Amino acid sequence: MSNIFIVDEELQDIRIDKYLNDLLSDHSRTYIQKLIKENNILVNDKPCKANYKVQAEDKIVVDIPEPVYANIEPEDIPLDIIYEDNDVLIVNKPKNFVVHPAPGHYSGTLVNAIMYHCKDNLSNINGVLRPGIVHRIDKDTTGALIVCKNDFSHNFITEQLKEHSITRKYIGIVQGVLKDFEGIIDAPIGRHPIKRKEMCINEINGKNAVTHFKVLKQFRNNTLCEFQLETGRTHQIRVHMASINHPLLGDDIYNHNKCPYKLQGQCLHAKTIGFIHPASKEYVEFEAATPEYFKNLINNVLK
């Protein structure tokens, strides 16, 4: 897999191994140095050394060899199925449930569960680690997720994701009381330059990201909101709400305030998903039941 980067003037004179370490968050600096030694990283079509300092307009091509993965096995893990036919499966993903395997984490994921449930009826466009997976939600975010059962459906849904035509509505509880009852956050999101596993508002290397929000209910110190996505960037709602000083309750990455409640990650639920069905070519929409912990917060805990 190749990645191409053009160096911005603001980032010149940084060592290339550090520069790429900030951009390729899934890989260590040591691994990047290994790629450099093996001539898998070229600057302006030429090999380089790890201590090379990048210059404005440098074209950097990073060729990451395909890793060798362990076998991914089907596992009999219960699924909360919202809808299923020959083309798609809609599941309500619970908290603390990783969508797909990754190096060092090959079991106990949604992929293991759908491989058991669907047998061989899954798209294979995304390879052995992500059969059937056309999009994903964070480990501690609950709610509706589309699984594609064949390659045609996968491509059909992917096109709608690219066109931003899929309806994706979330509900979430944020810190503080919002002054505006509805609004739009339009701010590009990219990798944090220092904290590699985090995202941030990034005007230089970020990708376009748009979130609509609407207040559903206000509490003394919190607000229940509905969010609708135009784009689907990693951690989009979490980053956007933190950027306006209303991070999600329980978010252990973007909310730096101590949570007074025992929560397992952010209070965020993918409530609604709608799309043009690959077979019928008609619009369909599905809702994922709100988890009990979320309902308890709204009805009994928050005042």
Label each PLM-derived region with a short phrase.
Residues 43-44, 100-101, 148, 199-200, ...:
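Thr-Gly-centered strand-to-loop micro-motif
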Residues 1-184, 188, 293-298:
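RNA pseudouridine synthases
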Residues 1-31, 79, 194, 203-210, ...:
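Pseudouridine synthases involved in rRNA/tRNA modification
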Residues 114, 199-202:
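Secretory N-termini
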Residues 89, 225-228:
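Short, well-ordered beta-strand segments enriched in hydrophobic/aromatic residues
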Residues 85, 139-140, 166, 207, ...:
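Short flexible coil/turn linkers enriched for glycine and charged/polar residues
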